[in-house]
């Protein structure tokens, strides 16, 4: 032990138990150490000692752990394992709202006295499901999960022992453990896909959970320490089958506090059930039971507080009634139970009259009569045995009177007997329901939950406290043996050297209680004596036990003869003997028992029979035990057959022995519940109270056992990653750089570290997988590491500062040299500059004078030259003007001469055209009359129509040719214009050259004439070229004008022809209307004849009204473009079948060839009527055998490539409706809808995204068609023709129901698909967003390559996988033409899901809450944000706010209150509870200071003040459905025609034939 100045330690305190201190002085004088301690309250304490290393010296303070370890999750990891360290760790965690702490194999649960629903939510259950203990923070769910997994994997029964004093939270803990098992079973059933099993198990689980409110109502009461205190012990076995599914349960109860029924101390209550029936029973029932209010009953008004704050007895009554019904208690039986309970209250009000020596009770006493009436017993006999007793001897029965006190005891005894019997009967009834013979045959394993009272000691301790402490002695002994066994097993498993660990054995105390001459045996012996009393029993105890060897654990008090003292494992307890004998007897008189057996209340009769059966089983158990003892002793002593009523003590002993046998046969887990204060105040921590409970519940004993061995255990990797710096780098650097690292390399490095740091090899042991350390070694290593790091930091700082200041010096030196050089250079440059300026001035003067003279001479010469050039220019211009005027005159003459004959020609041409027009008009009129005469013939009309159309086509072609020729002429014109521009540019060049030549003439007079002549020749030639071009341009312009006029004439003729055709059609419309009715009648008759043939063969005569009234209006076009019938003939049949009308129409029905149409209808009807083949082909071949087209960046899919299944279905459905096959269509659609949903349900793997999007697009297409059909039917009057109102309404109803069906299908497959996407995303998101470290250079320490090289396993995902996932969704939905609104909804839902599940996972991972992890998280989320921005979701970040703000929180400072306030402002999306959780779990790096405890307390206080129970949940709740269908908000697709496209790889012969037949309806008119 080291006590240098500055050492932190603990010093005893009367007020707080222990108080923190610091060594401020440590002097050694004359072999004595004089230490001065400064306590946290500034008090100074002096300590003197001879030896600082003597750990057993009580004067020495206890060493305190480093701050980073003070709030550890497992107390056994503390470096200094002592009482104050344990207490302080629990207190620190409690102040941070962490109520659970591990202490080795024990879970310590500190009652918060506050609602903590968020700790037990379904999200929390899922967080712990499948996790190993210690993987996430302590929780009772971790204990439950460990028990469940051990039972499942090791096939071994488990027990969870929940203990603690009243008010510590045992009942709540046991209840949530049961809920966890039920949830695990439900999850297990769901994973196995056994839906029926899940449904069945849910009922069993509900029944098991229903036992809680029943047991609480009949066995719990309000005490001074607890508002819901269990007044009995309970061991519940949850039974599992071979598949580890819950199939039932069994319950055992121990030592119900019967005296509470008749007596309650101040501020306490009776059992809850009495207050519940008074508050919840209907008024008429209460009148029948003669019930009023609690204050009117003696058994309920003694405590004085009939109500509990915050508890509604009416609602609790409803819960109890529901639970009773659930476990099989019939309503009639419930009424009988209430009668019994009411009778007990009335029994308590029976007034017994007191006489001098006796007591009396009239059979007419009102309360007695009511009680007997409710119990169904005789009031006279019942009253008799309240005031009398009967003693049975061998020869006679002696009846004597009871005094007043004895009569009260008799009255209360019968009440306690009835209530106890009722309680036991309820337990038996529950066991019968939850563990019937069918369940017994299936039991494979069980998990037992023991909810039992903790060690109790009060000012007055009676029989109940004695039994409770006896049970705790047995449990503590088993606990100590279990802890020792686990320690021993681990040492053996790791193959380390170990020595026997001594621990306090409480076997002497147990022997004192249960030996043949022990306390219980003497108590039973005294209880069987008629004159037995507490005083005589006490004397027997003193005489028998107050001597060796029992006097070590038994003693009598210094004063008085009414108590005895037992030295329990926790402390010595003095028991008051008053009432021991009476409570142990716990019997009712034989007279009362006979009266009760004669009851007319069937339920009470059943209860009494159950009591007798239980007593018989106890006697048989005792006989079996006695006979086995005789066999062991090998003495053939006869067993006396004496029938005795079992005492309460003997019954409790036997049940406790049975319980211990059960526990010893199972693997045990321990939960110790701690009550932090006596006032039940939320989040208040009383040091002394908690300390006493830690001592009593064996936690400190566990720690002492651990300290005696090797309490600290580190894996090799953890040890190296933490302490490798304690040896030189040359030792560990090669290991980290080694690629083929082995586990032996790791072990060797550990040995090197230990050899270099620890001299005493007894302080550690190296096992197979761990290193075991003695207590205090962890602090030793931390001190070495801190010293090493501090020296390294100093060294680094020294070198950094040295380099910095050297650099500064060198910079200053270089600066001085540079300054000198600059100064000298400046002086020299100034001198040189002056000389240069002098030289420049002289040179400027010289140059200026020369320039001035040259400028004057040049000006004179220039003036002369300009004068000469101007004169020459004027002469030349006059000559050019003369030539221009001459040429203009010639041009005017030629044009005038050409105008006169052209005008004459045009006049003649116009006259000729007029004549031709008149002749053509006369011919046209003649033809028109002929057409009118032949109009009566439909075939002639068709020919005329075709000729006119051909004429239109011919004229169109001519017009196109003319337009093409015009375009060529325009192109030629543009070329000529370009030539003119070129010529103009050439002329400009010549002009420029001419000017240059003129200037040259002034210097070269002699060559002027020749050059001028040459230029003139060139100019004349250029002018000729210009004239030629102009002439050609004029010719082309005239030709273009002529052709334009001709084109206009042809266009006019085309318009006239179209007008003529329109007039012809208008005139023929009258003829159409005349034959329309005949035509309709003919078509109807022929169709009927054809269908009559079919029905004759099938003996079915369906009603088929005309098809134009059956389907939505709007004729179908042969293709998307306008194609004439003649053109349609040349189209191949496959192409013609590609485009089909929505309703099956082809061209106008008036021109369909009747015979061909009849044949088509016959075959279509036959194919559609027999739906079995068609349904099977559509289901198996189309819907199940579909192929999804590839989607991606470079792939452009047409709509027909995507929705081909929908369009095929639409065609089939349309034809069914056209023929009136409504029943067949309903069957067909039902199978289609079911199959599509099944197909989507089975999607998985790489097919999930494309196939899901594919079916979303197809179902949307089908739904749009149905909406279109419904709208057409309801808005167009033509649909009512050919149908009566009944048929029309039936058709409307069919389409309306179909619309609803498709709405449901769209909703279902969207939900199924989205849930599957979430499930797929769940596997990837956490690894990719939370775990993966994509940002280089900021890898967290827990992801060190050392750990990954050896122990890395499992599938890993990165952000690239997540982005690929979202990219696949984007491209599939885009390629499949799914609306953007739907894509946006899907992505937003998935982003919210990623945000939720990643946050929920992150908040439970302690090691991931560091600033480096914050950087990595921020980087990963940023990549997701960028993807959203580039894919049309700029607001994607708002759906990832929790992750974004968590990343910010991890990177921000958190060391002051101002920092916390700033964090709260930035992280506005996080609740106070979430902020507190993240900050308290923040993983401090080696170079960071721990967050101060006062800051953590400040954050916790914010949660207490600002949060409500609804906002305390640290988890986000993912939106997992049901989801709203986003297609509801999107407009349906438009329908004009359906393109029937059947891919070549589909084998659908019947479907293809139907499509071909429908397509032939388009080509029939041209046949």
UniProtKB/Swiss-Prot annotation:
Belongs to the TRAFAC class myosin-kinesin ATPase superfamily. Myosin family. Residues 1230-1505 form the Dilute domain. Residues 947-1091 form a coiled coil. Residues 619-640 are annotated as: Disordered. Residues 1092-1567 are annotated as: Non alpha-helical, tail domain. Residues 4-57 form the Myosin N-terminal SH3-like domain. One of its GO terms (biological process) is intracellular distribution of mitochondria. It holds the Pfam family Myosin_head. The keyword Protein transport applies. ATP binds at residues 164-171. It comes from the Eukaryota. Residues 70-786 form the Myosin motor domain. Homodimer. Interacts with calmodulin (CMD1) and the myosin light chain MLC1 through its IQ repeats. SMART domains: DIL, IQ, MYSc. GO terms for molecular function: actin filament binding; ATP binding; calmodulin binding; microfilament motor activity; small GTPase binding. This is Myosin-2A. PANTHER family: DILUTE CLASS UNCONVENTIONAL MYOSIN, ISOFORM C, MYOSIN. Residues 446-526 are annotated as: Actin-binding. Keywords: Actin-binding, ATP-binding, Cell cycle, Coiled coil, Motor protein, Myosin, Nucleotide-binding, Protein transport, Repeat, Transport. InterPro entries: Dilute_dom, Fungal_Myo2/2A_CBD, IQ_motif_EF-hand-BS, Kinesin_motor_dom_sf, Myosin_head_motor_dom-like, Myosin_N, MYSc_Myo5, P-loop_NTPase.
